[in-house]
Amino acid sequence: MSDPAEVPTASPLLETVGLACERDWRMLFERLDLRLAAGEMLQVVGPNGSGKTSLLRLLSGLMQPTAGEVRLNGRPLAEQRGELARSLLWIGHAAGIKGLLSAEENLTWLCALHQPASREAIWQALADVGLRGFEDVPCHTLSAGQQRRVALARLYLDAPPLWILDEPFTALDKQGVAQLETHLAGHCQRGGMVVLTTHHSLQQVPAGYRELDLGALKAASGATVEPALGDPA
C-alpha cells in the first residue's frame, strides 16, 4: 500500500465516533473514528481475531458497540432500525441461503425482507451472476460457489447505496472474482459505498479506495486512526 494520503473532504455518509468493541472480555479495538463518503470503498484488513467481522457487524447494526456510535447519513444507527434495509445491504461470510428453496425462491424471500423485486428482475440478477438456467434448482444441490453467487445476486437488484460484505469472494472462481470486482468498483463509481473484508488481493478498485488496518490500530493502543488512501495490498 502507498503512503497515507490526505483524507477526502466529502461529507461522510457513514462514520463512527469513538467506536469500541469488546468480545469475550478482550478489547478488539477502541476509539475508532472512521469516515466514509459516497464513491468510496473501504477494505478492512488485519490478522485473525483483530475484529474485522465484528466491525462490519457493528456498521450493519447487527451488534451494539462497547462504546461510541455508528452514524449513517448523519444520524445514529440505533435510531434507524426500521430504515436500515433501505440504506444498507449486509452479506456475511456464509451464503445465508436456504438449501431447500430454489435460487429464485431464496432471492424472492430475501428481497421481501427489504425491497421486493419482480420475478423478471430476479431472473436477470441470477443471469448476471452466471446462474441462467438454475432459477428453479434447489440450492442444496448447487456447489459452494454457485450458492455464493445466489447470495451475491442481491447486489444486482435494486440494492441500497451502502454494501457491507464479509469475504464476498469466498468460493468464487477466477471469472466470478473478476466480475464481482468490476461490479463493486462500478457501484462506487456511481456514488455507492462498499465496506468489505477479503483475503483476496483486489485487482480492480475505484479511485476512492481506502484501507483500514485493525492490526495497526490495535498496535497503536486504540489511538484514533483514519483509513489511508492507497493501492490494494
From Swiss-Prot:
The lineage of its organism: Bacteria, Pseudomonadati, Pseudomonadota, Gammaproteobacteria, Pseudomonadales. GO terms for cellular component: plasma membrane. This is Cytochrome c biogenesis ATP-binding export protein CcmA. Part of the ABC transporter complex CcmAB involved in the biogenesis of c-type cytochromes; once thought to export heme, this seems not to be the case, but its exact role is uncertain. Responsible for energy coupling to the transport system. Its EC number is 7.6.2.5. It is a peripheral membrane protein. ATP binds at residues 46-53. PANTHER family: ABC TRANSPORTER I FAMILY MEMBER 1. It catalyses: heme b(in) + ATP + H2O = heme b(out) + ADP + phosphate + H(+). Keywords: ATP-binding, Cell inner membrane, Cell membrane, Cytochrome c-type biogenesis, Membrane, Nucleotide-binding, Translocase, Transport. Its main location: membrane. The gene is ccmA. It is an enzyme of class 7 (translocase). GO terms for biological process: cytochrome complex assembly. It is found in: Cell inner membrane. The complex is composed of two ATP-binding proteins (CcmA) and two transmembrane proteins (CcmB). Belongs to the ABC transporter superfamily. CcmA exporter (TC 3.A.1.107) family. One of its GO terms (molecular function) is ATP binding. PROSITE patterns: ABC_TRANSPORTER_1, ABC_TRANSPORTER_2, CCMA. Residues 14-233 form the ABC transporter domain.
